[in-house]
Amino acid sequence: MESIEVRVRTGSRLVSDFTSEIRDFCRRHGDGLLNVFLPHATAGLALIETGSGSEADLAAAIDRFLPRDLAYRHTHGSPGHGRDHLLPALISPSLTLPVLGGEIQLGIWQSVVIVDTNVDNPVRTVRLSFVDA
């Protein structure tokens, strides 16, 4: 297994497309499985279509499911930070993707994105681990 860490600046963006970094890593490999893991308590990974309004739809859904102004018991950090800690329960911090001939096998409209509601931490670490077939 090969495993690397990649640092990503998400800044204030809710959705950061990470697909090109994953493609670059997979090109060095043949067939196998890629695990993408985000070792943070306030962010997750998702497969969505980007550039078609899905990012705004996702933001609206997160605001409905996890409103920032709810009275969370988890109170450190900026206002609404309690919801950030609930996000990975709804949007997993890991994905496992098939790789064939060094190419991740995504659907035509799928992109791998980091979903990050925590504006207090603008830099994230992503672990990419490849297991050969």
Task: Map each language-model feature to its residues.
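Active-site histidine-anchored catalytic micro-motif
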Residues: 1-133
